[in-house]
Amino acid sequence: YAVASTEDQTAIISGWSACLNYFDSSLPFQLSFVNRRSRNANRYKVNIPAQEDDFNSIRGEYVEMLKDQIAKSNNGIERYKYITFGLPAEGVAEARPRLGRVEADVMGNLKRLGVQSRPLDGRDRLAVLHGQMHPGGREPFRFAWKDIPKTGMGTKDYIAPDSFDFRQSRTFRVGQMWGAASYLQIMASELSDKLLAEILELDAELTVTMHIQTVDQLKAIKTIKGKISDIGRMKAEEQKKAVRAGYDMEILPPDLITFSKDAAELLSDLQSRNERLFLLTFTVVNLAPTRQRLENDVFTVSGIAQKYNCALRRLDWQQEQGF
């Protein structure tokens, strides 16, 4: 997407919009982007053995070049992307076939965009949670379903860290690691497509999560129409004031003109282009081995947010809920 032409980018955005519009108000979903430090054993290894010829010096130079490029590429950061969805149901028996249909539709929509995806089974989900609760990549995940009856432990025992500490208002601890949960306050009229990319390119352990709830279409249209009516009344009041003061009644406050235009465009998108209205909570959880490194990472993410007219706010006394 980043290197595509403008026409191709528009086509990709259109396809991605169709993916998002698939989710109606009964299907809340979230997009999770996890940057995790890999264990040393998982790092790339370059080994080109020497041979009995005159090119060993070239092989050695090539190996060093590859190692240098690997070191610069991601510094051991592994990047994962997840989409999680749910639906209301009376029980597992009712939910299972419906979830299966939604899963097939979502994977089909992603495939049309050229995105390969696969469903996670129970062990995969435990591995994801284990990685979140053991940042730094030092603790390997060891689990097998057959071990549960033998050990008497539950699944939570296999993924729980040594400790949680949420006593501080703006930070928390997971084992020996420091963490901070923040949310993104979106003040920009249009959110740049580069914001998320720049955050995820950082050399830091973090999790970006977008919790998304679709607003019912009829309710969304009714709400926007109500806002347009309110803006119309405000316009009338401003025009009355202008007439009484002897000013031109066509001169209105700039904010009022902007709000009126934005509301009309939003209503047109909902009614004519089959778009949907979403409620979004954008959270960022940073993790680091030291308090100072954590504050530096949060400051860097905050700088990226400010660059795109947004603000990163710390969740005061809500660190546990944010995590």
Positions of predicted regions on the chain:
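Extended, folded cores of ATP/NTP-driven motor/assembly subunits in large transport
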Residues: 1-323
